Amino acid sequence: MKNPILNKPGFEEKYNAIGRKDSLYEGVFITAVKTTGIFCRPSCRARKPNVENVIFYDTAQQALQNGYRPCKICKPMEKQDETPDYIQTIIKELHQNPYLRIKDVDLRQRDIEPSQIRRWFKSHHNMTFHGYQRLLRINTAFSGIKKGEAISSSAFDSGFESLSGFNDSYRAVFGQSPTHTIDKSVLNIVRFTTPIGPMFACASDTGICLLEFTDRRMLETEFSDLSKRLNAVILPGDNPHLEHVQFELQEYFSGDRKKFTVPLHTPGTEFQQSVWAVLQDIPYGETRSYTQQAIALGKPKAIRAVGSANGHNRIAIIIPCHRVIAADGSLAGYGGGLHRKKWLLDFEKATL
C-alpha cells in the first residue's frame, strides 16, 4: 500500500469541480482566469469561466507569483486548505475510537453523501474513506500484538469480521504476516493546514521524524527512506508528539513562538545530524549563507556537502533550512518552494 501523499487531479477533473463549485477540492488547486487576472477557490460562487481562459495552480502563492489577484468573492488567501468541519468531526471520532466503523448508510443518516467524503480522502490522503478507517484499525491491532495480545483477539477487537480478512489487510500494509512483524514499528501521520499550505507530520514514540508540505518534491521518496531507516510503516493514528507539534506551529504562525520544544527523531548520518544541529542554532528572523553554516560547523570547505545535508532535512520550519540563503543574498533552493521560503523569512522578520 502506498504511503499517503497528496493526489493531484487532472485538468478535466479540476474544471468539472469548479463547475460544481466543489468545496471538497479546497486546498487541492487554485483557479486563475486569464481574462480577469483573478484567482479563485474551487468553490467560488462567481460565474464559471470558459475553459480556454482557465489555468490551474497548486497554491495561491503560485497564482500571485504569476501576476493574478485574489478574488474578492471567495477570498482565496483566507484559511487556505481548511478541512471541512464535518470531515474534521468524523476524523476526530475515528481517532478517539479506532474500533468504530462508519459505513455509507451511517454517512447518509448524517446527510453526508458517501461519494463526497470518498473524493475528499482520495484527494487529500490518496485513499478512500473506508481505506483510512481500515488503516486505523490495523494500527490499533498492531499496537495490541506488540503488547503481547493474541493475533485473533487483536483482529476481532479491531473490528475485522474474519481472521483471514485481517491477515490479508495486515499483509497489504506491512508486507508480512502478523507473526513476522514483531520487530517493526509504526510511524503515525497526520495532515493539517497552515497559512501557507497543508503539511504532513510523522511521529515515532521518540518524537517528530517528518514535517513537510504535502506538495514537496520527492515526498514519497522521503516516506520510503524514513520507513527503511526506522523499520516502520507509516499509518494514520494518534501520537502525543503530533498534537504537540500542531500546537506549537499554531503559535509560530500566530507570531507567538520563536523556539520549538517538541521532541525530534532525526535518523541520518553523523554529518547530517551535525548540519541539522547547526541549522537549529540560527536565530529566528536571521539568515546564514551556506558558507557561514559550513564555518559554524567547523568544516569551511564542506559547503556543497552542507547544502546536500540541508536538502535531506525532513523537518521543515523546526529545523529551519529556510534560513539558509546564497552568499549573494538570493534565496537559493527550498524543498517547500521558494515562495514559501520568502514568506517564512518575511514573516519572521516582521514578527521579531
What kind of feature is each model-predicted range?
Residues M1-G27, V33-E52, D58-S164, D168, ...:
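Basic nucleic-acid-binding alpha-helical/helix-turn surface characteristic of O6-alkylguanine DNA
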Residues K301-W343:
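Short glycine/serine-rich loop segments
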